[in-house]
Amino acid sequence: MDSGFQLAYLRDRQLSSVRRAASGSHSRTELYLKVLLVAIFLPEGLSFFVGDFRLSVARVLIFVSSIAAISRLSSARAVVCVPSDILAPVAGVWMMFAATITGGLTGLKGAGIDAIVFTGGYLTFRYLTPGDSSVRLARFSCMLAVLIVCIALLDPWNDKLFTYEFIKGITGYVKFSYEGALATKAETLYREGVIRAMGPLEHSILFGAVCAWFGTVALITFRSQVFGWAVAGIALIGVLFSQARSPLLAYLIGFALAMFYVATPRFTARWKLVGLCVTAIVVTVFTFSGNPVVTLVRLCGVSPEAAWYRQAIWQVGGRVVLGSPIFGIGANGDWDWQSNGALLSESVDAFWLANAMAYGIPGSILVLLTIVGACWLGSIDKSRHLTPEEGRLSVALGVVITTIVFLGFMVHFWGICLILIAVFAGMRANLAETAVLRDRAARAAETWV
């Protein structure tokens, strides 16, 4: 054979072997991420202790994968910097630093877990997600959400917390807050005498939020398929059986934004318009309303009783934050919730307020900026280097992040939901990087041609 032909043949063989090796590595990584997604939804009763730390399978996997993500980041590869890439580690460091200031070593132990699952969850899905697997992971997550809904519906079907009782029978795990609420048929677990669907989640509101999020992802990403509408419909059933109004509102917001997205294919400034409208409403309410939190919550369709309860939480919690604005009072800090007769417990039903109380205003802002910063590179759904489903997934994740920010003012997210928030942000940032890197590769190819 001609020497030039032989050289080209050998190069092609070498490139083919490299591609096969990379493909195998990507498939293993994708499988690991799917296993991690399953582990995230394992019930709390399957957690275990290592020393003073209560760990779950998901926490252990996130800790391991975050190390792998940092290692991959330090290797020589093309990286596109998204603001959340910097903000996520800073948020984790601040959580641990603030908790150490307020609670010493004990505070550090508790905050360290939150920092690992939030920052580690972000890093894992930001840097370990293979460039062509985002849609497959989203599809798998939606199928997993359908399974979670089916399991959760066993709660009202059997008139008991089926998953909790099942795991308790195996491991002996008892959660006294559940036992007390079950004994008294408290509203936290019952509505109109019917038990609220919860499944493996820590609370029915969190279950409803998860249904709203994955229903939105399915509806937007797979809108042209029966799969997308089926998942969205099943997710709505889950929201309704959670008997929680806030997740229902999130679902309706997601549906409305999805329809707006479909109806305005050529209107590139659509999200700026939505942002301006929301900003105008918020500014108007805070300018002219004597009880802005109540007004906003009532505008969202929440009952007057719930609206006034959240107003009381913000009034008392706000004073706590202003008393220690930089470092907060710690995740387990005592606060004078009894000073307001409307409050029934020390539970803070507002994610942003709870973070500010635990880690100070900077801690809450850093978490907020992390998830918002994942969308900082702007709309990428029209990128000619993303597939149509990848483009729609980027929009879906942006809508989900919007509902998270909104619900964070009247719902507290912890446990499984806290991890999922980091996962959504990491996937959105990964998609943005994929679009930029493919664009660079295309430009380089055009240059060589």
What kind of feature is each model-predicted range?
Residues 32-40, 276, 377-410:
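Loop-to-helix entry and N-terminal half of a specific, functionally important transmembrane alpha helix
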Residues 48, 292-362, 378-385:
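Long extracytoplasmic/lumenal interhelical loops at the membrane interface
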Residues 1-29, 72-74, 388-389, 422-449:
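A juxtamembrane structural motif centered on a specific transmembrane helix
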Residues 28-33, 83-91, 124-173:
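Interfacial loop-to-transmembrane-helix boundary motif in multi-pass membrane proteins
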Residues 150-161, 259-301, 318-323:
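A membrane-periplasm/extracellular boundary helix in multi-pass inner-membrane enzymes
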Residues 138-162, 169-243, 248-261:
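Alpha-helical transmembrane segments of multi-pass inner-membrane proteins
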Residues 64-68, 395-449:
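Transmembrane alpha-helices of multi-pass inner-membrane enzymes
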Residues 28-48, 59-123, 401-405, 449:
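N-terminal hydrophobic segments of proteins, predominantly signal-anchor/transmembrane helices
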